[in-house]
Each structure stands twice: as structure tokens, then as C-alpha cells.
Amino acid sequence: MAGVSLYGGQDLPMLDKLTIESFEPHVGTSFWLHTENRKIELRLTRAAKVMESEAARLARTPFSLYFLAPVLLPQQIYRLTHDGFAESLDVFLVQIAGDAGGFTYEAVFT
């Protein structure tokens, strides 16, 4: 996502610049999770605002992203890439559900 200039043009890390609006156009598209020896496709299924009542005191409105993956992964920080973002994203993913259709992971941004 080249040219992101939020927060008055301050030089912030990529993740600190992103808002829910950065991800909403990408719901339904594929992100790629990179491990040492494989690349796994994740589908962004939903982007949702959280803690609306406390958002006024924060630099951005907190939000969660929900991804569907074909494999079970331990909760940890993963490197994600997407064609719509110029830089890779290091995101903490937690598995919140799973069934025959795959495993759902959540990433929370505050």
C-alpha cells in the first residue's frame, strides 16, 4: 500500500498506518502467509470494527480481520503479503474456529 500518509505524515511502521478502510476493499481476496518452508493461502473473510466506545481516545478505530485457511496453525506472528500492499505485514494470528471447511483466524489491530 504505497503512499499511506495517515497521522499527519508521520513516519510510522506500516501496521500502525493501516485502518479498517485499508482492508475492506480486500475482503474476499487472498493473502499469503509465509513460513520458513511454505506459502499458505488465506482468504480475508471479514473486517470488523471493535470497541467503538473507546475509539475516540485512540489513534485509530480498533478493528479485527478474519481469515480462512486450509490448515491448522499455532497462534503466533506470521508474515502476510497481498498484491494490494507494497510491504509485507507481520500479524499476530489466533485460531478462533475450525471445521471441515477450514480454520478461522483473527488478527486484532488496536
Language-model-derived ranges and their functions:
Residues 44-46, 93:
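Conserved hydrophobic positions within beta-strands
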Residues 48-53, 97-101:
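Short, conserved beta-turn/loop elements at beta-strand boundaries and strand-helix junctions
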Residues 20, 25-28:
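A glycine-biased structural micro-motif
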Residues 2-13:
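Short, Lys/Arg-enriched N-terminal segments with co-localized hydrophobic residues
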